[in-house]
Amino acid sequence: MAEFFNTPGGIAVIILAQTLAVVAFVMISLLFLVYGDRKIWAAVQMRRGPNVVGVYGLLQTVADALKYVVKEVVIPAGSDRTVFILAPLTSFVLAMIAWAVIPFNDTWVLSDINVAILYVFAVSSLEVYGVIMGGWASNSKYPFLGSLRSAAQMISYEVSIGLIIIGVILSTGSMNFGDIVRAQDGDAGLFNWYWLPHFPMVFLFFISCLAETNRPPFDLPEAESELVAGYQVEYSSTPFLLFMAGEYIAIFLMCALTSLLFFGGWLSPVPFLPDSPLWMVAKMAFFFFLFAMVKAITPRYRYDQLMRLGWKVFLPFSLIWVVFVAFAARFEWFWGAFARWSTGG
């Protein structure tokens, strides 16, 4: 049996099993993310939230998903049927395949490539195509305006995210997530993590992730008071479910990136406790809690304020920080906190 797994067929079986495990983890997490999002929002507003289906309403998300699946798929007259159906599928698939390079410890990763950051950045940049396709194919003014907003918003904040990530790459000398996490390992526990030397960028990265994933207060592409529901106006049933699932999976991915880049990934925050994938999951859950709290307590920005923040505040500050980190890493300022060459770079 052991010899079989060394053959091409056995290797294919292992890869398939690993892929299914990652998909299962993301999809099961998705159910709890939606439930948690609704519960947190309800708690802030002093409501109960989901509490009928299952114990404490835990099965409410499953019931809602089944409701969407059994509904009829309504395609508007005059729309491009092929593109209309492909749009939500594109958003969902692109959100899923980004997880191929996300590690949960030194060995629990589907594809441990040396350009993992570049891969995630490229895939997340492509997700805007699903939104644009959905807005254009609907043949309606509100979806089209929402898709244009989304394209401009995502492109604007991807620049800031990219520059912030470059700062981490300069400190580590690698684009591999495993190397970045190992560079944050040390006897000081959480004080070895990159949140300390890159402290200002943690806030910019988190806010940029909110804008990148169209989360409040930056949910302009689907602003109900202005665009009804934006690019999702004409969608119902399974296509709408795919759009929503893709959005939450992208949010969870940003939580994973924040954990890996700045908070040590699977590393323990205290030296006397062992490192574990559970630390990674706990950190991701904490950052999703912050996503949900921001949604519950902040008002929506105006579109011009959103774009001004991205281009006139975040972009210059991120660019200045990259230059600063480059010099700090080159000359090993601050006791070498910005120069942790885990790969011998």
UniProtKB/Swiss-Prot annotation:
One of the record's GO molecular function terms: quinone binding
Presence of keyword Cell membrane: yes
Cell compartments where the protein resides: Cell inner membrane
One of the GO BP terms on file: aerobic respiration
EC number: 7.1.1.-
Catalytic reaction annotation: a quinone + NADH + 5 H(+)(in) = a quinol + NAD(+) + 4 H(+)(out)
Gene Ontology CC, one term: plasma membrane
InterPro entries in the record: NADH_UbQ_OxRdtase_su1/FPO, NADH_UbQ_OxRdtase_su1_CS
Keywords of this entry: Cell inner membrane, Cell membrane, Membrane, NAD, Quinone, Translocase, Transmembrane, Transmembrane helix, Ubiquinone
Mode of membrane association: Multi-pass membrane protein
Pfam family, one: NADHdh
Keyword Cell inner membrane: yes
Homology family: Belongs to the complex I subunit 1 family.
Subunit description: NDH-1 is composed of 14 different subunits. Subunits NuoA, H, J, K, L, M, N constitute the membrane sector of the complex.
PANTHER family the record matches: NADH DEHYDROGENASE SUBUNIT 1, NADH-UBIQUINONE OXIDOREDUCTASE CHAIN 1
Full protein name: NADH-quinone oxidoreductase subunit H
Source taxonomy: Bacteria, Pseudomonadati, Pseudomonadota, Alphaproteobacteria, Rhodobacterales
